[in-house]
Curated annotation (Swiss-Prot):
Keywords: Ribonucleoprotein, Ribosomal protein. This is Large ribosomal subunit protein bL31B. HAMAP family: Ribosomal_bL31_2. The gene is rpmE2. The keyword Ribonucleoprotein applies. It holds the Pfam family Ribosomal_L31. GO terms for cellular component: ribonucleoprotein complex; ribosome. The keyword Ribonucleoprotein applies. GO terms for molecular function: structural constituent of ribosome. The lineage of its organism: Bacteria, Pseudomonadati, Pseudomonadota, Gammaproteobacteria, Vibrionales. Gene3D superfamilies: Ribosomal protein L31. InterPro entries: Ribosomal_bL28/bL31-like_sf, Ribosomal_bL31, Ribosomal_bL31_B, Ribosomal_bL31_sf. Part of the 50S ribosomal subunit. It comes from Vibrio campbellii (strain ATCC BAA-1116). Belongs to the bacterial ribosomal protein bL31 family. Type B subfamily.
Length: 86
């Protein structure tokens, strides 16, 4: 490999904020934030909204709250058109 053109590969702590889970994965991600991990070492830190710990495909759980909001919004906007007219 050509020296000096590849990003640094290092362990990074990822934090899934939706379920408050932390995990360390090797990555080339660049971040200025750091966190001290359980082993006493300091690692780069990156927050995630969704990961395999919280995504419905991997957990088998559906997030009904968001879907209910969309259905209610649709019914509020277009519900009057579906009423039976005598």
């Amino acid at each position: 490999m050509k020296p000096g053109i590849h990003p640094e590969y290092r362990p990074v702590v990822f934090h899934d904020t939706s379920v408050d889970e932390y995990f360390v994965v090797g990555s080339t991600l660049q971040t200025d934030r750091t966190i001290e991990w359980k082993d006493g070492k300091t690692y780069p830190y990156f927050t995630l909204d969704v990961s395999s710990e919280s995504h419905p495909f991997y957990t088998g759980k559906q997030r009904v709250v968001q879907a209910e909001g969309r259905i209610a919004n649709f019914n509020r906007r277009f519900g009057q058109f579906s009423k039976d007219k005598d």
